[in-house]
Amino acid sequence: MKFLLILLLQATASGALPLNSSTSLEKNNVLFGERYLEKFYGLEINKLPVTKMKYSGNLMKEKIQEMQHFLGLKVTGQLDTSTLEMMHAPRCGVPDVHHFREMPGGPVWRKHYITYRINNYTPDMNREDVDYAIRKAFQVWSNVTPLKFSKINTGMADILVVFARGAHGDFHAFDGKGGILAHAFGPGSGIGGDAHFDEDEFWTTHSGGTNLFLTAVHEIGHSLGLGHSSDPKAVMFPTYKYVDINTFRLSADDIRGIQSLYGDPKENQRLPNPDNSEPALCDPNLSFDAVTTVGNKIFFFKDRFFWLKVSERPKTSVNLISSLWPTLPSGIEAAYEIEARNQVFLFKDDKYWLISNLRPEPNYPKSIHSFGFPNFVKKIDAAVFNPRFYRTYFFVDNQYWRYDERRQMMDPGYPKLITKNFQGIGPKIDAVFYSKNKYYYFFQGSNQFEYDFLLQRITKTLKSNSWFGC
């Protein structure tokens, strides 16, 4: 389950502040920026040296750039006016860029009929107004999905709505008026799905104070399994702002995200049980659709699932693709990583998606023909990036192309036959990835071939699922 917060920070920012400024105000802003980046962008403050490099080091600059890119700001790497203003804006406290170890697996409800109960009522509003605001917030999501929500007055509900102040039993205390607005938990048992609202805020039905309906729509999105969107028009965008509730609508991005988890309103069939539909990991006939590294992890894609294998560790976890990337399709057919850029490319049919820091980039998918493929190429079977040559190899049927990532163009003289230049590797490759110890791992059906690209020969034949201790 993912713990989520909304922060409402009232300080104001002024001036563009270089990271090496020595004034008290500038240092206060830098310290505030560090705390912000630690919370939302994974800045490891303990690793920063306790010197002026703390304020000018590349690590913090990179995190500022990461934040600016995600939130649609001009990427300067500095704590300039617009960046500080965004840092002080009302927002949700879940990190904008996740390290995968922090992500829950498959955070969706495995049923279409979900109950909620309002545990207690804020004195700021009439009970009827609270009931109406919460009911309408749930209705926003039921209008675009097959989900049905029912309010119960007693007993155990799937989602519990609570108004509380200070420490309230979940190890995530509220901090009084003007700080944390609310938090929620992702789908699951126990506290899973519950939404908590800070009683020290002044809850309202209008633009004054804090609008309960708008806050609840955002929090319920998290309760249903949605993360944040980088689309500023989306209700799931990290920052909070009031909009006219009479004309409020979910954005296209919100709708795509929630429907990727639950389908559209016409899909009233029971959600598949993952115990029945998840491929058996140690099935000797198991094959994969795509495989790629992501940092020190290996992702194995199959249908709507992926397995996550951390290098040198025996433990493996299986997740829904939609749990990490709600807007992406199932059935990923090829994938590769450029680790130095924190980029992953995912392919299906004649389209591809770009993932940066585990977040989908806007304005995707794009056509695979933008790489320079001829029109007769309709899909990519497999792809792999070699950092030694800074080239990506694309495998299609019995041929392969080589792409120069620096010049952003295909190398001349391609395509070439796979069998001619990859001795022992046959056509129709299912998946391939590169290992830092000089090997390609080619997957064909239930078999896997360790290939030394320096010696240009197969060095080992394995089962495709040998990475999992099968």
Curated annotation (Swiss-Prot):
Cellular localization per UniProt: Secreted, Extracellular space, Extracellular matrix
Binding site for Ca(2+) 4: D289, E333, D381, D430
Signal sequence coordinates: 1-16
InterPro entries: Hemopexin-like_dom, Hemopexin-like_dom_sf, Hemopexin-like_repeat, Hemopexin_CS, M10A_MMP, MetalloPept_cat_dom_sf, Pept_M10_metallopeptidase, Pept_M10A
Residues annotated for Ca(2+) 2 binding in this entry: D158, G190, G192, D194
Tissue-wise expression: Found in alveolar macrophages but not in peripheral blood monocytes.
GO MF term list: calcium ion binding; collagen binding; core promoter sequence-specific DNA binding; endopeptidase activity; metalloendopeptidase activity; sequence-specific DNA binding; serine-type endopeptidase activity; zinc ion binding
Motif (Cysteine switch): 90-97
Main subcellular localisation: secreted
GO cellular component: cytoplasm; extracellular matrix; extracellular region; extracellular space; nucleus
Co-factor binding details: Binds 4 Ca(2+) ions per subunit.
PROSITE patterns reported in the protein's UniProt record: CYSTEINE_SWITCH (PS00546), HEMOPEXIN (PS00024), HEMOPEXIN_2 (PS51642), ZINC_PROTEASE (PS00142)
Cysteines paired by S-S bonds: C282-C470
Residues the record lists as binding Ca(2+) 3: D175, G176, G178, I180, D198, E201
Catalysed transformations (reactions): Hydrolysis of soluble and insoluble elastin. Specific cleavages are also produced at 14-Ala-|-Leu-15 and 16-Tyr-|-Leu-17 in the B chain of insulin
Hemopexin repeat residues: 279-328, 329-375, 377-425, 426-470
Protein name: Macrophage metalloelastase
